[in-house]
């Protein structure tokens, strides 16, 4: 289980643009928790606290304990609205954690991409997917998926079938897809032309 952050929240009973503006004047932002077949819960959060958490790496896959009137809810961020100028958080959607497995987006970390064999030979590391959708055991939710691409040659593609996922996780889709490629000097090859890593 990855680190769990804590957030204090207050119940929200007034809605609409005017109510949201009033909250923001108090240094708070509106938020909602829904999903897992549960009744949605409308809350407000301290703006500085949630913005600080948002700026942490891999926020979208961060487990959070939200406490409302001494009741605690384990949630995951779903969507975040930011102020267009200040980048402070203006609204957050959370989802309740499911009972056994959780469908979620997880960031991909391509470890060693600057040192990859194909890059050293003049190729360009092209990221096709920055996140993947996984089905994860709720007791083993990863912050990210780390892939070592140091030995990836030039003119190759990295496919989902070659990736070892964290324990308790699987891809939502069974269809194979490309995560990254190393493009040769003369431009990218098609997936059919580009050999898979390890071949």
Curated annotation (Swiss-Prot):
Any GO BP: translation
Domain of life according to the entry: Bacteria
UniProt-listed SUPFAM superfamilies: Ribosomal protein L25-like
Keywords carried by this UniProt record: Ribonucleoprotein, Ribosomal protein, RNA-binding, rRNA-binding
Gene Ontology MF, one: 5S rRNA binding
InterPro entries: Rbsml_bL25/Gln-tRNA_synth_N, Ribosomal_bL25/Gln-tRNA_synth, Ribosomal_bL25_b-dom, Ribosomal_bL25_C, Ribosomal_bL25_long, Ribosomal_bL25_short, Ribosomal_L25_dom, Ribosomal_uL5_bac-type
Coiled-coil segments: none
CDD domains hit by this protein: Ribosomal_L25_TL5_CTC
Alphabetical list of Pfam families matching this protein: Ribosomal_L25p, Ribosomal_TL5_C
GO cellular component, one term: cytosolic large ribosomal subunit
Claim: rRNA-binding is one of the keywords in the record: yes
Family: Belongs to the bacterial ribosomal protein bL25 family. CTC subfamily.
Its biological purpose: This is one of the proteins that binds to the 5S RNA in the ribosome where it forms part of the central protuberance.
Subunit structure: Part of the 50S ribosomal subunit; part of the 5S rRNA/L5/L18/L25 subcomplex. Contacts the 5S rRNA. Binds to the 5S rRNA independently of L5 and L18.
Protein name per its UniProtKB record: Large ribosomal subunit protein bL25
Native source species: Rickettsia akari (strain Hartford)
């Amino acid at each position: 289980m990855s680190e769990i952050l804590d957030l204090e929240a207050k119940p929200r009973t007034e809605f609409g643009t005017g109510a949201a503006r009033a909250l923001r004047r108090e240094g708070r932002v509106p938020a909602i928790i829904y999903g897992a077949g549960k009744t949605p819960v409308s809350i407000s959060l301290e703006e500085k606290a949630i913005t600080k958490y948002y700026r942490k790496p891999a926020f979208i896959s961060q487990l959070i304990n939200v406490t409302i009137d001494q009741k605690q809810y384990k949630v995951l961020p779903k969507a975040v609205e930011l102020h267009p100028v200040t980048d402070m958080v203006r609204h957050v959607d959370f989802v309740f954690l499911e009972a056994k497995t959780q469908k979620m987006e997880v960031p991909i970390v391509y470890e060693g991409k600057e040192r990859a064999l194909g890059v050293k030979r003049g190729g360009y590391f092209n990221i096709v997917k920055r996140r993947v959708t996984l089905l994860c055991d709720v007791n083993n939710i990863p912050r990210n998926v780390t892939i070592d691409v140091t030995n990836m040659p030039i003119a190759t593609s990295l496919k989902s079938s070659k990736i070892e996922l964290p324990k308790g996780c699987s891809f939502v889709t069974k269809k194979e897809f490309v995560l990254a490629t190393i493009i040769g000097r003369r431009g990218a090859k098609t997936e059919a032309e580009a050999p898979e890593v390890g071949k």
